[in-house]
UniProtKB/Swiss-Prot annotation:
Subcellular location field: Cytoplasm
Main localization, broad class: cytoplasm
The keyword Cytoplasm belongs to this UniProt entry's keyword annotation: yes
Enzyme type, top EC level: oxidoreductase
Listed pathway(s): tRNA modification; tRNA-queuosine biosynthesis
Protein name per Swiss-Prot or TrEMBL: NADPH-dependent 7-cyano-7-deazaguanine reductase
Reactions mediated catalytically: 7-aminomethyl-7-carbaguanine + 2 NADP(+) = 7-cyano-7-deazaguanine + 2 NADPH + 3 H(+)
Length: 151
C-alpha cells in the first residue's frame, strides 16, 4: 500500500476533545476523473445544547462528489465524535461539519442533511449544499422520512 500520509488510519487514536482539536484527513481519489457520489451516514451523531448542556441527537447524511480527494472515513468518524461534548446549536453543527469537509477534500459538490431528533417537542432538519449538483450526477434521495410522532 502506498503512503497515504494519514495519521489516524491503522492506529489507536483517542477521541478528540473538540471539533477544533479533531484532524479530518483526506486521501487521493483514484477515480478522480469519474463523476460519482459518495455517501456517509451518521445515524447517532451527538452534540450538546450550548445553553442547557443537554445532549442533542441527529441522523446526518453527507453526500459528496469527490474531486482529487476522498475523506478518510476513520478521521471523519473521529471528527464527528468530537462534537459529543461540544456545545452548539443544530444549525451550526450541521453546517460546520459540511464546511470542514469542503475545506479539506475540496469536492466537486457536497450536500448535508442534519435530521435532528426533537427536544422541546420540535424536530429540526438542517440542509446545506455547496450549490447545484453537477450535471449528470446521480443524487439519490437521502432516505430519511420526516419526523412523525404518534399523531
Amino acid at each position: 500500500m502506498t503512503d497515504l500520509n494519514v495519521t489516524q488510519l491503522g492506529r489507536v487514536v483517542d477521541a478528540p476533545e473538540s471539533p477544533e482539536a479533531a484532524v479530518l484527513e483526506r486521501v487521493p481519489n483514484p477515480q478522480s476523473d469519474v463523476l460519482y457520489l459518495a455517501r456517509f451516514v451518521a445515524p447517532e451523531f451527538t452534540s450538546l445544547c450550548p445553553v442547557t448542556g443537554q445532549p442533542d441527537f441527529a441522523h446526518l447524511v453527507i453526500d459528496y462528489a469527490p474531486g482529487d480527494w476522498l475523506i478518510e472515513s476513520k478521521s471523519l468518524k473521529l471528527y464527528l465524535t468530537s462534537f459529543r461534548n461540544h456545545g452548539s446549536f443544530h444549525e451550526d453543527c450541521t453546517v460546520k461539519v459540511a464546511r470542514k469537509i469542503v475545506e479539506i477534500a475540496q469536492p466537486r459538490w457536497l450536500r448535508i442533511g442534519g435530521y435532528w431528533y426533537p427536544r422541546g417537542g420540535i424536530p429540526i432538519d438542517v440542509f446545506w449544499q455547496t450549490g447545484p449538483a453537477p450535471e449528470g450526477l446521480w443524487v439519490p434521495d437521502q432516505g430519511v422520512a420526516p419526523y412523525r410522532g404518534r399523531g
